[in-house]
Amino acid sequence: PALAKDPNNQVVAMTMRPNQPASWQGVRLVAYGAKRQSTPNIHAWVTDIEAKVIRGEAAFHCAQALKASGFTPDVIIAHCGWGESLFLKDVWPQAKLAIYSEFYYHARGADVGFDPEFPSQITEDCRIRVKNLNNLLHFEVADAGLSPTHWQASTFPEPFRSKITVIHDGIDTQAITPNAVVSLSLNTAHGA
């Protein structure tokens, strides 16, 4: 919304949410939808990437319609986790693509394989590698990555890690800081 306040900018957001207003705080909203669903009984290791390709195809067709109407972005910022941005550079190759780089999956020590009580199976390792195809395909075309924390950025291997800039997306910790004179006491079942 901040960029949309400048009349020299045209900000467009593509959304899979139907029945949205035409704009929100100066941002033009363009709704689109997938033409198909995931394949029943598809191989378990490719369910994730198939869903992302389906969403990417839907966004690709929406982007083609936007281009046909005369819209050409200078910059595209997208969360790559759902696949929508997979093919946007095919429509607008000159646009700079920055992807929200939230997490690169690992078979050990991150989201799976970290608890000795629940050891990861070798097949899980294979599934995790295939799950990263979306990240790999995005970094093949992305000009930059944006990550909210240093830890999240650190989950990505090189050469991708060096393309990622950490930009905190939550509370402004420079403006919102602890107040040393404020305290809070709680009465608990333990008497404290």
Question: What residues fall within each predicted segment?
Answer:
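Conserved nucleotide-sugar phosphate-binding/catalytic loop shared by glycosyltransferases and other
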Residues: 20-45
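Structural alpha-helical scaffold elements that stabilize or flank donor/cofactor-binding regions
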Residues: 69, 137-138
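Short N-terminal targeting/anchoring amphipathic segment
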Residues: 64-82, 96-98
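Carbohydrate-associated surface elements
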Residues: 151, 170
